[in-house]
Regions:
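Catalytic domains that recognize anionic headgroups
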Residues: 1-375
Length: 375
């Protein structure tokens, strides 16, 4: 797991990625248009509204975001994942430039020793439970997700990864929780302090992932839906940016705010998790970028961007290139963008598509006939 400590920021250059899980561009923009205050808060950023993710789920999206390297079932996924997190060329470059790398999330667990030297905030956890009754309740829910009558299934839904968060760390340090509320509460309580040296932070938050908990003010409510969770994600993001501004480290930070993939929401915002995914609908994430010392009104670009382009843009941003100039593609350019699709938990069989048009247009997302199956 990774320890909580989102507070140190350096007076040198920082590189900060805030990943809001499962925020879909189309739904996001509906929320954006209801909130004129967002535009002022996201000044200095360029919003890329025609961005394609590479995959429909977090596990494969995140390594692509930080490495630009596609996973095609040619090796065990864990081998690929460890290689990317430990030795991706971008991370190697940052280390050579004396960046301290930290990664905040609570989903990934690695064997002891595997990730040594990768991030400075990893904690070893013992698998002892701090709340056995809660654990038992969650196990019963998990069984219910599979065997309960259909009507009861929504009541049984919870994020199975929360089982992991019941582990104790050796010194009882609190592990980072990806829940929007936990991060938001920490932001309100803690000051960001100056430290020497260059910092890279990758912060993975729940965003608008199921189950839906939050209203726009990040209160846990019973009738939360996908849209209120997008609002809560923005509330948390804006509070974080304000903290960086207050601490005087906003200008000298490259800041990326993105989602790892979109979401295929049908009709009204539904509050039960989708388990029978459509073929498509998750390929259109959000992407905000701010370069070093940018100072301008919020701007939108329709350039046809793919997540495989991100790492190339990171290097340019660190060199001082502005956010509207960090990709080689410009608005109006035509290109085909790759998308590897698999069904939920069916990553052994990936089907290649090409997006021949606008990222959000499913009618132009065409299968190429290529598939990538696990050996």
């Amino acid at each position: 797991g990774s320890e909580m400590c989102i507070r140190d920021r350096s007076t040198d250059t920082n590189f900060i990625i805030v990943l809001l899980d499962a925020v879909d561009e189309e739904c996001f923009w509906q929320v954006w248009e209801q909130h004129p205050e967002y535009k002022e808060e996201m000044r200095d950023f360029t919003f890329y509204n025609n961005t394609m993710s590479g995959y429909a789920y977090t596990d494969h999206s995140l390594p692509l975001i930080i490495s630009g390297e596609w996973y095609e079932n040619k090796e065990p996924f864990l081998d690929y994942q460890i290689r990317i997190f430990k030795n991706s060329p971008f991370f190697e470059y940052l280390k050579k430039q004396d960046y301290t790398l930290s990664y905040y999330e609570d989903e990934y667990k690695f064997e002891v020793g595997v990730m040594d030297g990768a991030f400075n905030n990893l904690a070893y956890t013992q698998s002892s439970l701090w709340d056995a009754p809660l654990f038992n309740k969650r196990i019963i829910k998990m069984v219910g997700m599979k065997y309960a009558p259909y009507l009861l299934k929504p009541k049984c839904w919870f994020n199975v990864d929360m089982l992991n968060n019941q582990e104790m760390t050796p010194k009882d340090e609190e592990l980072f929780s990806w829940k929007n509320k936990a991060f938001y509460d920490d932001l309100k309580e803690d000051e960001i302090s100056y430290v020497d040296g260059k910092r890279f932070k990758l912060i993975h938050l729940m965003g608008a992932h199921v189950p839906f908990y939050y209203d726009k003010d990040v209160n846990v409510i019973d009738n939360a839906n996908y849209y209120t969770c997008i609002e809560s994600s923005m509330t948390v993001t804006m509070a974080y940016l304000d903290k960086l501004r207050e601490a005087g480290v906003y200008d000298n930070s490259v800041i990326i705010v993105l989602s790892d993939h979109g979401y295929n929401i049908e009709g009204d915002a539904i509050d039960t998790p989708q388990r029978n995914e459509n073929e498509t609908g998750r390929q259109h994430p959000i992407l905000f970028i701010k370069g070093l010392n940018e100072n301008h009104d919020f701007q939108v670009s329709g350039a046809p961007i793919s997540f495989e382009d991100l790492v190339g843009a990171y290097y340019k941003l660190l060199d001082g290139v502005a956010s509207d100039d960090c990709f080689e593609y410009k608005e109006g350019d035509q290109r085909e963008r790759r998308y590897l699709l698999y069904k939920y938990l069916g990553e052994d069989h990936m089907v290649e598509y090409m997006q021949t048009g606008y990222a959000g247009d499913e009618s132009t997302l065409i299968p190429t006939g290529r598939v990538f199956d696990a050996k």
